[in-house]
Amino acid sequence: TMGCTVRYVIGNHDYVKGKYGEALYESIYGPVWYSFDVGNIHYVVTSLQTGSDFKSCYNKNDRWKWLKNDLDKVDSNKKVVMFNHTKSPSDDFVLSFGKDELDLKKHNLIAWIYGHYHYNYVSDTDGVLNISTARPDCGGIDSSVAGVRLVHIGADASVSTNMIYYSLAS
């Protein structure tokens, strides 16, 4: 009905009781980690958390191997956009997994899009946009107005974003 592909990102409340925390989510929406290309942009959907309400069956080493392998296969001319439930674990976008590190900026990271904090916020950190978005049904935990965020990523890797606000009053 929206005329576009919809992709999902697992959140902390999607880890529910079952065989393992993300079992129900995976049975409905598919894998919790995946990537795809559109033009010269490589999109990566990750779950870097180890669960929340219920424990994940994947460990940090699983995540590290998958992400490193995925990014190592990306053409060096492509830009990368990360989707994750929470913000980057580090302000410099260098992910540490034990003694190993993965510098996402060396893989042409241009945006990190997340939602866990339930507020609408955009900032630029050394050329990487941090884009946080609240739930569309109730606004933000910071009392921001309800709405949806549109993110446009152009063929030239330009990123623009704007909010469409609406009233929840009946």
Where are these regions (language model features)?
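Extended active-site neighborhood of metal-dependent phosphoesterases/phosphodiesterases
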Residues: T1-D75, K79, G98-A111, Y119-S160
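Short, solvent-exposed loop/turn segments at secondary-structure junctions
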Residues: K17, P89-F93
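Short, well-ordered beta-to-alpha junction loops that form the rim of enzyme active sites
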Residues: L48, F83-K87, H116
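Short, solvent-exposed aromatic-acidic interface loops
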Residues: T161-S170
